[in-house]
């Protein structure tokens, strides 16, 4: 298996790593798990830690010269490496800890391929993938292109703190905006799986406050996926995401993005 990982392209490595993490997440679901306090009300479970170890095993075997930034383990791997993988082994830990299956496993090569695994999507989970140019959902060996659409009218809004954009922007205020109520229906899943759903046409958009999220272990895979699928991706200020970025607005199409920005800017 290790030799076969080394022969994969970057998208294949991302898929293999995300699936390895998703396997652990499924296996440990519903068990009593120890919690590791991270401060500020945040915590990791033994599932987070075990899933990250499984992901790192794949990445180290397949790309030993690359560096890794993990949500739980921090920076690891080759010092001075030009390539860096961003890993969030269990996005939605709070959901998972109380028995909710709304979680994702995120693996992204910074500026390249990425995979977002839904451990509980379908019989054996599904993986949303990009090679940096194309985007598809993979079930087993079957692939289906991702086609975003704003037709659902469903918009995921992240209401988890912190809220650095306040008081200028408050996500909760968007939900009460009369134009939002007339055009969209809010959803709050508290996991970046929602980004994959925008790329797949299951959501019209995703909105979150924040700073520069382009290099975040939580968001990098979903952002890469949405860009490759043809979504419109900006900060909450309408500007490109990056070092000076503010939060994230990902919309299935330009018109959905325009409508949301008109409400956010008011």
Q: Regions from the language model: what does each represent?
A:
Residues 128-131, 141-152:
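Short amphipathic beta-strand/extended segments with alternating polar/hydrophobic composition
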Residues 114, 135-140, 157, 205:
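Short hydrophobic/aromatic-rich beta-strand segments that constitute the beta-sheet cores
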Residues 1-90:
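N-terminal subdomain of lithium-sensitive/metallo-dependent phosphomonoesterases centered on the IMPase/IPPase/PAP
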Residues 64, 81-82, 112, 152, ...:
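Short coil/turn connectors at secondary-structure junctions
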Residues 71, 117, 209:
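Conserved residues at the C-terminal ends of beta-strands
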Residues 79-136:
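DPxDG-like acidic metal-binding loop motif
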Residues 148-266:
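An extended, acidic
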Residues 25, 48, 59, 93, ...:
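Residue-level signal for inorganic ion chemistry
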């Amino acid at each position: 298996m290790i030799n076969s990982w080394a022969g994969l392209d970057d998208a294949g490595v991302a898929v293999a790593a995300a699936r390895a993490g998703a396997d652990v997440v499924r296996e440990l679901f519903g068990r009593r798990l120890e919690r590791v306090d991270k401060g500020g009300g945040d915590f990791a479970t033994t599932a987070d830690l075990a899933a990250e170890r499984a992901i790192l095993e794949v990445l180290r075997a397949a790309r030993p010269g690359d560096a890794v930034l993990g949500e739980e383990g921090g920076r690891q791997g080759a010092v001075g490496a030009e390539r860096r993988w961003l890993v969030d082994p269990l996005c939605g830990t709070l959901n998972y800890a109380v028995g909710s299956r709304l979680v994702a496993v995120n693996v992204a090569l910074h500026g390249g391929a990425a995979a977002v695994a839904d451990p509980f999507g379908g019989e054996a989970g599904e993986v949303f993938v990009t090679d940096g140019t194309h985007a598809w959902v993979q079930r087993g060996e079957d692939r289906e292109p991702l086609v975003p659409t704003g037709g659902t009218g469903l918009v995921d809004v992240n209401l988890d703190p912190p809220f650095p954009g306040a008081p200028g922007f408050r996500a909760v205020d968007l939900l009460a905006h009369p134009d939002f109520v007339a055009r969209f229906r809010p959803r709050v899943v508290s996991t970046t799986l929602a980004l994959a759903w925008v790329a797949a046409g299951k959501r019209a958009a995703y909105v979150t406050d924040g700073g520069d999220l382009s290099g975040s272990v939580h968001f990098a895979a979903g952002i890469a996926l949405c860009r490759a699928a043809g979504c419109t991706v900006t900060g909450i200020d309408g500007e490109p995401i990056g070092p000076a970025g503010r939060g994230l607005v990902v919309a299935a199409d330009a018109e959905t993005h325009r409508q949301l920005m008109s409400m956010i800017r008011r």
